[in-house]
């Protein structure tokens, strides 16, 4: 392992020198003066080197490609963090392609047989040794099950884990070094960025997780005309092998074939937007890797086109609170209610509670007003989120990984939609959905569901009260800091009182020792205190 790490370090050093990334690093404004001086004394900087007529973004992209698949995927993820990177570098990194030569079919067959515990001929009536596709983490083969179903078999590359561990270790070393030498780097949280990447790559190595994600997404859109997700054949799925239904669709980027079958491009673009908002707000479970290589279009009904999604290795979800605040933020933004946008960021805990709402409102207005000089159909929804994140970052916003996944997915969907139909007005498509969702949040059915969830907590009230009294009875309890309640915007004291009223209402109502009206008053008061925001 140590020998592998040393060899990898030498390889990284050669690539840095070849693409003159040392120049790029030394130009960083966050670099302290003493490190610039140290960098200027590096031996190779005094030797003649050929001049590269490439932009800094292109040099970084080519270097990551040379360093191999793990660095390529890291660059792809980094390209989505436009709140951290300059636009020219982020745009260049977006061109990184996760394509590598396939590994020998003999190794694929061996790994499949090891995982399934059976010979390939015992499981499949036909297995095509030539892969359909190959990427840095896995490759895909076509096959047919003994029961007759046409399937694809995805298999993880052999001997990948040691390389990943080594590369991730070096990324962490570089991130920690950056945090140690620069306060500006610490503000960008490089260790957190690498940690997010580590989680992503580890998740992609577990094909049972991908199978579970695909099954969930398929169930969410069962019978839907919007999206089809291939069936998972669980009997033949293992941590390193995934067997799914083979789909036959048109790649979403093959515009010529889509035109030939007379696809309704306007409907196709609008359905992409509807799929995104349905996943985020109805299901709180969204496919977070919706780049064109993972999206196909069904050939069945071109006048009512249906998407087909594959590769569910990366998914995202939002809490109920984040869903609510995101929807209200977007609606307030498009109404130019910047005060409300600022207040929502503070209330949600996305920026520190001590943030001055007037200053934050002014910063948002400065960034966003120029955007509204364009017609609504020309406004990028993804860029709106990006600009909000960039502005909030100046106010020490801690951007959650799920929100980054959301912004990346929205940019992909929006870019794809406008490629299919340039006149796509994303706001006109999204606004009715968001407003309907907000209305449903306060519908009697939803309020009853919320009430039932709160009532489930009633049996725990006596223990909560006992714990509180014990804490207050302890010496120095009044000098101790208050307990840290989770959720910055919930009035837990009010909810506790509301729950007590509910218990009282139940006691009065069931005891039947008094008239019924006190129970109704207590019930109404309890419901109000529990459900109020």
Curated annotation (Swiss-Prot):
A Gene Ontology cellular-component term: plasma membrane
Pfam families, alphabetized: ABC1
Topological relation to the membrane, as annotated: Multi-pass membrane protein
Statement: the UniProt record of this protein carries the keyword Magnesium: no
Pathway stated in the Swiss-Prot or TrEMBL entry: Cofactor biosynthesis; ubiquinone biosynthesis [regulation]
Subcellular location, record wording: Cell inner membrane
List of catalytic residues: 289
Residue ranges annotated for the Protein kinase domain, each copy included: 126-494
A biological process term (GO) from this entry: ubiquinone biosynthetic process
Segments crossing the lipid bilayer: 24-44, 510-530
A single GO molecular function term of this UniProt record: protein kinase activity
Annotated CDD domains: UbiB (cd13972)
Keywords: ATP-binding, Cell inner membrane, Cell membrane, Kinase, Membrane, Nucleotide-binding, Transferase, Transmembrane, Transmembrane helix, Ubiquinone biosynthesis
Annotated residues for binding of ATP: 132-140, 154
EC number(s) stated in the UniProt entry for this protein: 2.7.-.-
EC class name: transferase
Function of the molecule: Is probably a protein kinase regulator of UbiI activity which is involved in aerobic coenzyme Q (ubiquinone) biosynthesis.
PANTHER family tied to this protein: CHAPERONE-ACTIVITY OF BC1 COMPLEX CABC1 -RELATED (PTHR10566), PROTEIN ACTIVITY OF BC1 COMPLEX KINASE 7, CHLOROPLASTIC (PTHR10566:SF113)
Annotated family: Belongs to the ABC1 family. UbiB subfamily.
Protein name: Probable protein kinase UbiB
Protein source organism: Pseudomonas aeruginosa (strain ATCC 15692 / DSM 22644 / CIP 104116 / JCM 14847 / LMG 12228 / 1C / PRS 101 / PAO1)
Biological classification of the source: Bacteria, Pseudomonadati, Pseudomonadota, Gammaproteobacteria, Pseudomonadales
